[in-house]
UniProtKB/Swiss-Prot annotation:
The keyword Acetylation does not apply. Homohexamer. It catalyses: (R)-4'-phosphopantetheine + ATP + H(+) = 3'-dephospho-CoA + diphosphate. Keywords: ATP-binding, Coenzyme A biosynthesis, Cytoplasm, Magnesium, Nucleotide-binding, Nucleotidyltransferase, Transferase. This is Phosphopantetheine adenylyltransferase. ATP binds at residues 9-10, 17, 88-90, 98, 123-129. NCBIfam families: coaD_prev_kdtB (TIGR01510), cyt_tran_rel (TIGR00125). It is found in: Cytoplasm. Pathway: Cofactor biosynthesis; coenzyme A biosynthesis; CoA from (R)-pantothenate: step 4/5. CDD domains: PPAT (cd02163).
Length: 161
């Protein structure tokens, strides 16, 4: 069974992330969205909420599972029986970092391959950081995130106002 692990902070999950998950769900038997705690990134949403948002966005995909984690990614992949890391590349600028990460993961988990997918071009410019910035300034984010995510962002920024 091919099990792919798609790790990230997903703060929040975007339509770009969703696009990669949908495509991965057609390529692999089982897709695990691995939502990293990432405390050093100081996420806008707590881990539990990011996991719940990702579950809501992907609930129509029966072979997709969403799990939060705070351990080393290589260890988590082994625990989950994953044999592939999925990473998205939006632009050439993403490649250098992802290449280093893939090489480090290969050292830590030699049985797990890294696979890079580019998003559909309509999502290639979307990032969680940009979505948060637009939402914080009251902009329309409906083209970039699922409605449940847009609602969560609106609610979060109301509380901060």
């Amino acid at each position: 069974m091919n099990r792919v692990l798609y790790p990230g902070t997903f703060d929040p999950i975007t339509k770009g992330h969703g696009d990669l998950v949908e495509r991965a769900s057609r390529l692999f038997d089982h897709v695990i969205i691995a939502v990293a705690a990432s405390p050093k990134k100081n996420p806008l949403f707590p881990l539990e909420q990011r996991v719940e948002l990702a579950r809501e966005v992907t609930k129509h995909l029966p072979n997709v599972e969403v799990i939060g984690f705070s351990s080393l990614l290589a260890h988590f992949a082994k625990e989950q029986g994953a044999n592939v890391f999925l990473r998205g590349l939006r632009a050439v600028s993403d490649f250098e970092y992802e290449f280093q990460l893939a090489n480090m993961n290969r050292q830590l988990a030699p049985d797990v391959e890294s696979l890079f997918l580019t998003p559909s071009e309509r999502y290639s410019f979307i990032s969680s950081t940009l979505v948060r910035e637009i939402a914080a300034l009251g902009g329309d984010i409906s083209k970039f995130v699922h409605p449940v995510v847009a609602d969560a962002l609106t609610e979060r920024f109301k509380k901060q106002a």
